[in-house]
Amino acid sequence: MRRFISTMAQSGPRRFAPLKEVVAGQHHELPKLQGVIFDVDGTLCQPQNHMFGQMRDVLGIPKSVDILEHIYSLPTPTQQEEAMESIRAIERVSMAQQVAQPGLTDLMAYLDSRGLRKGICTRNFEQPVAHLLTKFLSGSVFHPVVTRDFRPPKPDPAGLLFIARSWGLTRRVRDERDEQAVRDVIGVGQGGNSAAAPREKKQQQEGAVGPDAHGHHEEVGDASGLIMVGDSIDDMTAGRRAGAATVLLVNDVNRHLSDHEHTDLVIERLDELVDVLDRGFVGREIS
């Protein structure tokens, strides 16, 4: 099992200082929340689970097979692109029926009022994401927006670490043990989809500087001050492996993830986070 990148071993539940005190300039011993990263389908908009069955039907794969992994495993670039376009077509049709999650605009207005950065990390392609932001959140800035074109996708933590690094949130790699933890998370030397990318692109996608000539990283994206909000196990696992706190937006389909070891907090509506963050984020105790 890959470990997550963290600045120190965690003890007890994840906590962040109350935002109402941070904004008021009050000193607090708890860490300050640095930003929030959101998934899209099932998180910013209501779930469109019908898409996944349609995608698997058109690809001819069972539910047990990951859709993107299947496409990336196809033998030729032409086959990969044809398969990718077949699922894009399904998403284009479905995006016209997007419905905003309850509490969406209230939460975003609150985060904007508190000056918090917002990013997106999704397995969707860019068109449905742009459609949602234009339709429901035209006055709210999300940057960066990490979509399907970024590889490797969730549950790999690379997208979250890239966002952290783009926000200037980095840490130095301390020693050989820490270096091994970094390698375990970002998969250096283990192959994978990003291994064939040019070095510059690979470093950017890993959210890391390095490796140098000796295979060591100088610094990595530090997501320990971030929250990942999502509705799937991929979201919770990517957040946990990146070192971020995780929030599950629960529904009838994913309720079993409420007790998952990668889930720090569970909410029924997005605007529940307003009070949680204002009073101070406290995750659940995980044994």
Pin down the residues of each PLM region.
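Alpha-helix N-cap/helix-start and coil->helix boundary motif
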Residues: N49-F52, Q101, F125-Q127, I233, ...
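Active-site neighborhood of HAD-like aspartate-dependent phosphohydrolases
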Residues: F4, Q10-H70, T76-Q79
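Short, acidic loop-to-helix structural element flanking the phosphoryl-transfer center
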Residues: V93-I120, E126-A130, P157
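Conserved SAM-binding loop
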Residues: L44, K118-C121, M228, V266
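Asp-based, Mg2+/Mn2+-dependent phosphohydrolase catalytic module
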Residues: M1-Q34, A109, H131-S287
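Short, basic/glycine-rich phosphate-binding loops at helix/coil junctions
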Residues: Q80-E91, S140-P144
